[in-house]
């Protein structure tokens, strides 16, 4: 197979008209055993209406990237680099400005909706509170708008559900409530941190379809954090593959999914269970993700990589090898396709 020939927008042009521009993002935590770098010089951009999938194993830095953008890092965390949203720097904003930004411009959906909803308040009260606080709506206006948003996320009998408590909903319905709450203020950016992890496969598909529909309806940019590459194929426009806090590969979702050019991306895809592989042994990536306190020299994936070479003891640069596509690997692209 030849080197990929895809009409992809060069990175410089993507950054020029981006809603969100992240440059050299670095997240470090102070621990008794030393500093841990959870995110290491991350770069990406996102335009209005686009979906970026951030993919990787546990501990790769996916969630910490989101928490850094939202200003939700733990007390021992430090941020470096730059993140501009609508041309405005958002890292290290004062708390009152962050609260306004999080309420009106950027929203986040967390993994477990049950722990995100107040079990002592009716769902309707929690939705209405957002609108009354941030949109200065009256109680009656907030009620009707909340019902409309529950309808938008395909909640059956939305008006009736407003009077129910979180424990009366199924997992999928609770996640629909969280999506509705996140979209009430019509944010320009929605960050979804593993939003389907606790759901069964059928409900996962429904939530992914719903997010796709809402993205088109509201022209919302989405950052989808996941370890599931099937999710990436179904909803994302671009993909960032992370390992040990670093970018391994970045590009158009279709290209990364069908023609990955980094051994780690290839390993993740090979590990996805297939319905047509009956009787075959499931492939895995050997070894374990590295200890971030004691990273291997050079490429962090080197100890687990089937293509490791002597040169991999040096850190490979992240290079744009074709317009809009990045990778950090010394192995020639042609030998991986």
Swiss-Prot record:
Key words, A-Z: ATP-binding, Cell inner membrane, Cell membrane, Membrane, Nucleotide-binding, Peptide transport, Protein transport, Translocase, Transport
Residue stretches making up the ABC transporter domain: 20-269
Protein name, per record: Oligopeptide transport ATP-binding protein OppD
Top-level class of the enzyme under EC nomenclature: translocase
EC number from the UniProt entry: 7.4.2.6
Family: Belongs to the ABC transporter superfamily.
SUPFAM superfamilies listed in its UniProt record: P-loop containing nucleoside triphosphate hydrolases
Entry-linked CDD domains: ABC_NikE_OppD_transporters
Reaction(s) catalysed (UniProt annotation): a [peptide](out) + ATP + H2O = a [peptide](in) + ADP + phosphate + H(+); L-alanyl-gamma-D-glutamyl-meso-2,6-diaminopimelate(out) + ATP + H2O = L-alanyl-gamma-D-glutamyl-meso-2,6-diaminopimelate(in) + ADP + phosphate + H(+)
NCBIfam families, per the entry: oligo_HPY (TIGR01727), PRK09473.1 (NF007010)
GO molecular function, one term: ATP hydrolysis activity
Cell membrane recorded as keyword: yes
Protein species of origin: Escherichia coli (strain K12)
Main location: membrane
Pfam families named in the record: ABC_tran, oligo_HPY
InterPro entries: AAA+_ATPase (IPR003593), ABC_Ni/Peptide_Import (IPR050388), ABC_transporter-like_ATP-bd (IPR003439), ABC_transporter-like_CS (IPR017871), Oligopep_ABC_C (IPR013563), P-loop_NTPase (IPR027417)
